[in-house]
């Protein structure tokens, strides 16, 4: 019998326990032996839980029990999760996690520890929730050089933007609905709406693609707080919708660029039709071309099912599972991983007349004049040109309120 421990009994942790209980026979068949939860570590009081005898508060109980083969980490964050996971791997126990912050920050180190101590560190649920993407990318696409990853990886902001488009809601109203439905945190939704969640996910995928650690702090990140109903309407005039896009590109010289930003997505682009809490990630390989991974990116049971699938793999294959899943440690780079390539942009400028905006930004057209300024579509510019234009706007008493890159019509 394989005995496991669960660290954290919040949304995902309780989901993992539920999946293991409801589908016990199926999980055991796939693992090749019965699977049993022996401990659940959580500081809260679960004395009224039907399985209260499983709950413990001392991590050392798990570490000192030789029967524990696999540890599931669903605490989140890094303060407790990182030292606990590190200790488990150093003791030769495999770890399965959904913790994107920990993987994005310490992935290379933890993968190295797993390899050193003959166990596995698995994190399928950290990027796509219940939608598989880590395993397909490093196994099914192993014959490809991946040059680009681009997609919608945060279900909360995608739900909010869908509401803003379909129901003409403002940011605050869309956020309130997302919170009422449990898609956004009630106390502090900033990880989602400010893009940090998406940033961690694209950092993980970038590390996987590039073979060395790419850190979230080096990825330019903007969220959706600045998006207004007027921007949504202007996007419609341009034949686009607004989506929060996470992306990375790898040049032929090995250079890496990455970012998280709200973008104009033309309706002909397949990402434009990805709505509500669904995610979609487009991966470009040199041999296969484009592959899209699509599904619900979050949710208790979808995410838990991905974690349990990792548990099965760890039990069945041990240190051999996904042994090619590895990237090298690296120091954070100086500066940001920006993309120098030119693109079309939507800019919203306040405080100066449309004619002045047109004179500053050059070739393009006014989209909306309802502001004390205007919304302007720039046909072609790079980040350096946009920064120079912003300085000129400020020099004449204006301010740039929003900049949105337009994606190509076809991926």
Each predicted region: which residue ranges?
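A conserved regulatory-domain signal marking ACT and ACT-like small-molecule sensing domains
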Residues: 311-411
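Substrate-binding/catalytic subdomain of NAD(P)-dependent oxidoreductase enzymes
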Residues: 175-273, 278-280
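Catalytic, metal-anchored helix/loop core of enzyme active sites in primary metabolism
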Residues: 146-150, 158-161, 165, 183-190, ...
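A short hydrophobic/small-residue beta-strand
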Residues: 94-96
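Rossmann-like NAD(P)H-binding beta-loop-alpha module
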Residues: 68, 115-197, 204
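Flexible, glycine/charged-enriched surface loops at secondary-structure junctions
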Residues: 34, 188, 192, 213-221, ...
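Rossmann-fold NAD(P)-binding glycine/threonine-rich loop
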Residues: 81-87, 91, 100-138
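N-terminal glycine-/serine-/threonine-rich beta1-alpha1-beta2 phosphate-ribose binding loop
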Residues: 1-91
């Amino acid at each position: 019998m394989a005995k496991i421990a669960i660290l954290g009994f919040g949304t995902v942790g309780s989901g993992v326990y539920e999946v293991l209980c409801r589908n016990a026979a199926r999980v055991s068949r796939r693992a090749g032996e019965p699977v049993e939860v022996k401990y659940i570590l959580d500081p809260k009081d679960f004395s009224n839980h039907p399985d209260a005898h499983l709950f413990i508060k001392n991590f050392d109980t798990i570490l000192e029990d030789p029967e524990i083969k696999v540890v599931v980490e669903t605490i989140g964050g890094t303060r407790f999760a990182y030292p606990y996971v590190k200790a488990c791997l150093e003791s030769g126990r495999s770890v399965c996690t959904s913790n994107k912050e920990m993987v994005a920050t310490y992935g290379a180190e933890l993968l190295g520890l797993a390899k050193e101590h003959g166990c596995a560190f698995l994190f399928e649920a950290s990027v796509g929730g219940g939608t598989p993407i880590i395993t397909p990318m490093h196994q099914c696409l192993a014959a490809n050089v991946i040059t680009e990853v681009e997609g919608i990886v945060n279900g909360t902001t995608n739900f909010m933007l869908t509401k803003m488009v379909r129901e003409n809601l403002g940011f605050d109203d869309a956020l309130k609905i997302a919170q009422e439905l449990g898609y956004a945190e009630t106390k502090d939704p900033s990880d989602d709406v400010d893009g940090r969640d998406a940033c961690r996910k694209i950092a993980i995928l970038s590390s996987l693609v590039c073979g060395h650690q790419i850190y979230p702090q080096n990825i330019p990140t903007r969220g959706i707080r600045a998006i207004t109903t007027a921007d949504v309407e202007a996007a419609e005039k341009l034949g686009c919708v607004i989506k929060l896009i996470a992306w990375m590109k790898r040049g032929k010289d090995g250079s890496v660029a990455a970012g998280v930003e709200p973008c104009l997505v033309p309706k002909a682009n397949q990402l434009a039709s990805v709505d509500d809490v669904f995610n979609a990630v487009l991966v470009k390989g040199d041999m296969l071309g484009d592959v899209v991974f699509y599904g619900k990116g979050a949710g208790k049971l979808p995410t838990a099912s991905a974690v349990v699938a990792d548990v099965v793999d760890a039990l069945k294959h041990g240190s051999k599972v996904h042994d090619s899943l590895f990237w090298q440690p690296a120091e954070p780079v100086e500066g940001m991983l920006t993309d120098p390539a030119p693109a079309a942009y939507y800019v919203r400028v306040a405080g100066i007349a449309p004619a002045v905006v047109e004179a500053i930004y050059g070739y393009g057209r006014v989209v909306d004049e309802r502001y004390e300024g205007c919304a302007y579509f720039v046909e072609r510019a790079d980040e350096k040109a946009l920064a120079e234009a912003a300085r000129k706007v400020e020099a004449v008493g204006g301010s740039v309120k929003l900049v949105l890159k337009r994606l190509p019509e076809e991926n």
